[in-house]
Regions:
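Methionine residue identity
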Residues: 1-3
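Glycine-rich phosphate-binding loop of ATP-dependent small-molecule kinases
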Residues: 7-182
């Protein structure tokens, strides 16, 4: 039983990807004191990142994707808990309108971060490929258009100075079932 955590960092001129698999058993013995110390260290690093983003007028889009109950919202809450509210935005878009279905990337462009800001996306443009086809929110044509254009669109973001960090959270079906029934 475990959780798979994948992240990808897109920024000029490099693309970096890592896959980390966490086994829950490793963390069951983590006591509250050690947990608080580790959490504090991580939050200090997030504040340092935000200060650098502000100082250097960076634009960072953090995209959180994954299975339901895998921990996306909890992680976003952790990331943003001590950040300066004026320099980050939380974005969670619901079911797309008819116009948004036909102008998929424009739907997201209006929420991209400005200079000196961080945008935290609770789900991202990848819902077009990951969940919308199974929920009936997009046609095969929309799906294929997305798949044919997403890399070019992300290249445009990067060339415009936006750093994109994508996280994907996955848990096994048994763990997901337990969480949904809790």
């Amino acid at each position: 039983m475990g959780m798979i955590f994948v992240y990808t960092i897109l920024s000029f001129p490099k693309i970096y990807m890592s896959v980390i698999e966490y086994k829950f058993e490793q963390y069951k013995t983590l006591g509250p004191i050690i947990y608080k110390k580790e959490k504090y260290k991580l939050q200090v690093e997030l504040l340092k990142l935000q200060e650098d983003v502000i100082k250097n007028r960076r634009r960072i889009a953090l995209c959180f994707e994954g299975r339901d109950t895998a921990g996306k919202s909890s992680t976003i809450n952790f990331f943003s808990e001590h950040l300066r509210p004026s320099n980050f935005r939380y974005i969670h878009l619901g079911i797309p309108t008819k116009e948004e279905k036909n102008n998929w990337f424009q739907r997201w462009e209006k929420h991209l971060p400005e200079e000196g800001k961080i945008a935290l996306f609770d789900r991202s443009w990848y819902t077009r490929a990951l969940t919308e086809p199974t929920l009936g929110y997009c046609s095969k044509k929309h799906y294929e258009e997305f798949m044919n254009n997403v890399n070019r669109w992300e290249d445009k973001l990067i060339s415009n100075g936006i750093e994109v960090v994508k996280f994907y959270f996955s848990i096994d079906k048994d763990q997901q079932k337990r969480r949904l029934s809790a």
